């Protein structure tokens, strides 16, 4: 689930009426905006949209025309919401470049990925506030927005429930079995992961059991096509499938993932600042890792550089050496005190807590 989905679920659980607009997808429906009647969730109305014809071209070459076309979408969405929107939480400035068209009482622009372009700048200017999980984005756009909020990623309730139980029971196992298990979650066909480093790490550590969760094929993958899933990613995936000490779990539900990750002794985060859309400055998976309490061996992550929650390295060589050192000293790195520190941080950033922070922020606007 994406952050916006977790936020929608949490808001609905609080009794708010949420109108969740899906990303545009082609369908046989004659309308370009319509309610998805196939999904029934209390307090949530799912709204499907279809792509604007030649939308990318129009957005960049004829922004005025695109703005008029997308206005019809906003008008229909607002009508479905009863022609009254208290708060618009916009996560998609690539499509909705003029959020004021919705006529919401408050408009919040959430930039969780570092999108660039004049259309994003325009959306920032129209928003009442800008919210992001990384200062990389805020530093670039905050002059264009009015107030802004740096907000960490949220932790899903499935992870939080297990973390709270572990704190309650003082359940801080250093190592789950004789063979050390190291975990990684994420789309293996998305650019961003340092696959060269990951391959070297796996080859140099045959004594370690590596576990990967997430999409591991083009089918049912949220990568839009082979053009995004480069040959490098596909070659890396084939390498993983052929490695005897690698376990591929595929896609799991949030609840399943939260349970299965508890069996790990350590986690790795190895993104490339050159290929990751957010310059490897943050990731929601880190918060999920932290909720298990187990040590995280990572490349540089700017949003965590000052809190000592990750064991970070400056370059590939240092990462490999750090990995060896940490695994040889799990008693130290997975001590009860270290695990509790990580879990406490994760529990301070549940989606429930983030919504409370957003609500306090909105009251200042």
Indicate where each model-derived feature is located.
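Nucleotide-sugar-dependent
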Residues: 2, 255-260, 267-290, 297-308
